[in-house]
Swiss-Prot record:
GO molecular function: manganese ion binding; RNA binding; RNA-DNA hybrid ribonuclease activity
Predominant cellular place of this UniProt entry's protein: cytoplasm
One Pfam family this sequence matches: RNase_HII
GO biological process terms held by the UniProt record: DNA replication, removal of RNA primer; mismatch repair
Native source organism of the sequence: Geobacter metallireducens (strain ATCC 53774 / DSM 7210 / GS-15)
Textual note on the cofactor: Manganese or magnesium. Binds 1 divalent metal ion per monomer in the absence of substrate. May bind a second metal ion after substrate binding.
Identification of the protein by name: Ribonuclease HII
Length: 213
């Protein structure tokens, strides 16, 4: 078994990276992605997905390009056909304690650890590797070029959105159900008026200015 070479892979499809890795002897390839690095409130959620080779998932793409109903539909398809799905969560307190990058990597590692099928290779969206002793490849915009990463992006996004809908019930007035914690004008105005709530990220600009000394 040798590590795959990604330098010249020619014309690409959403299965290109998975197929290349499989041809090099790896058979449990997990795509890993996150949702929620940028918001001012709530957790960062990561997902890891292992798909059966050649699985047909029409419509799967970067979750940010899909409508909420489309994501929910695809979430069901992915959950039904995947060999394994894992989810990891780093909450607001963890983010404030160790910073958003380290919290994201921790959530990703947790997601991989939750997989019922142990992966032998990881495809990761972005530029940062996960602190796990597994062969892995980071892919910029991987959620638009890898079927496994795209699937993980959908699982992570839907999972986090559902959490933020619940937080909207616990902490009314901030509009979490609408903006999911992102720093839009209405959210910033709510923070200025009401002050931060328990799930706000106290180290983030837009929130820290309103934290009592």
């Amino acid at each position: 078994m040798r590590l795959p070479l990604f330098d010249d892979i020619g014309e690409r499809s959403l299965w290109t990276f998975e197929n290349l890795v499989s041809r090099n002897g790896f058979h449990a390839v997990a795509g890993v992605d996150e949702a929620g690095r940028g918001p001012l409130a709530g957790p960062v959620v990561a997902a890891a997905v292992i798909l059966p080779q050649g699985a047909e998932l029409p419509g799967v793409d970067d979750s940010k390009k899909l409508s909420a109903p489309k994501r929910e539909h695809l979430f069901g398809l992915i959950s039904g056909c995947a060999l394994a799905v894992g989810v990891g969560v780093a909450d607001h307190a963890c983010i404030d304690r160790i910073n958003i990058l380290q919290a994201t990597l921790r959530a990703m590692a947790e997601a991989v650890g939750q997989l019922a099928v142990p992966p032998d290779y990881l495809l990761i969206d972005g530029i940062s590797t996960i602190p796990l002793n597994l062969p892995q490849k980071t892919i910029k915009k991987g959620d638009s070029s890898s079927i496994s990463i795209a699937s993980a992006s959908i699982v992570a996004k839907v999972t986090r959105d559902r959490m933020m809908m619940e937080y909207d019930q616990q902490f009314p007035g901030y509009g979490f159900a609408e903006h999911k914690g992102y720093g839009c004008a209405s959210h910033l105005a709510a923070i200025a008026e009401l002050g931060p709530c328990p799930i706000h990220r106290k180290t983030f600009r837009g929130v820290k200015e309103h934290v009592a000394p």
